Structures are given as C-alpha cells and as structure tokens.
Amino acid sequence: MVSACLAGLHCRYDGRTNHKPEVAELVASGLAVPVCPEELGGLPTPRDPSERRGDSVVSNAGRDVTAEFAAGAEAALYIAEEYGCSAAILKARSPSCGCGRIYDGTFSRTLIEGNGLFADLLLKKGFEVFTEETWPGLSPEERASAPYPGGLSASSSSSDISPHTEPTCGR
C-alpha cells in the first residue's frame, strides 16, 4: 500500500502531488495499491492544511477534522486488508500518513515525534510502515532485472516492499 500522492495522484491538501517515480512504479506494476485516507474520509481536494494536536486533527482554519481523518484511516485499512498488504510506504510528516515525525499542530512547521492517524492504525494492526524518506527501495539486483530503468520485474513480489517482519516505522 502507498500514499496516493506519492504515486502521482493529485490528492494532496493543495491539489498537487508528491510524485515519487519509484513508488508510482510499484503501483503501475501491480505491487502496491494507492490510497488517500483523507479523501476516503470525505475531505475534498483541495482542502485546508491539517495537523495533529494530540489525539485530534485540526485544520489551519480551526475546524476539527478528526472524524474525517479517522473514517479515512479505517477505510484505507479495510482496503489494505482486502488486498493482503503487509507494508506501506506513506507520506512523511502527514497528519494521516506520517510515521515517526509529524507537525506539532501549531502550523509553524515544527516537527515532533509521532504518527499520523492512518500510520498509527497500520502499526497497531502489525503492518510495517515506511515513509518515502525511510523506504529502502529496490535492491541493485531488482533494478538490474527490471524490464525498464528503475522498474520492477515480473519476478518481484509484494515482499520486496518490506524486508523486515516486525511492525515499525522504517528508519
């Protein structure tokens, strides 16, 4: 499973994308499914930026959007389980997908230790969670056997996404 914005979908809060070609290739090859928990929770794109404040998620306009974020996390978890996913590559620092470090809820770009709601849920369910900054990527051997530069070969499997077994934020 991957954050849809990393796969090139325009679902970021500002309607843009956080496209990472290597993540998009996982989706294109059928090795990962893209999700945007915030859209799945009913939030529009574009939308106000939001940050976690303790157990809540609030927009920069002061609106409590915790219910939408929680509903989206549950919907994305359902998709992950239906597809048999065991690992995820999620958007760093996001109030949904951040893993290990997120913004502190003051909209000052200050980072604190913590996870987004969706990342938290995946970790509690035993998934391994990476961000685009911590995912180790494909090995040189996998790259060499790929049918196109930087791509995946037909012999690749979903286990290529997760080289570890314990549920942690990849570092």
PLM-predicted stretches and their roles:
Residues 86:
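Short acidic/polar active-site loop segments enriched in Thr and Asp
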Residues 40, 50-79, 110-171:
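Divalent-metal-activated hydrolytic enzyme cores
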Residues 8, 42-43, 95-98, 137:
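Short, active-site-adjacent cap segments at secondary-structure transitions
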Residues 18-59:
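Short, surface-exposed acidic-centric catalytic microdomains
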Residues 8-15:
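Short N-terminal binding/cap micro-motifs at the start of the first secondary-structure element
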Residues 83:
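Active-site charged/polar residues at nucleotide-handling catalytic sites that mediate phosphoryl
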Residues 1-4:
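Short, hydrophobic/glycine-enriched beta-strand segments
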Residues 91-107:
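Internal, conserved structured core segments that host functional sites
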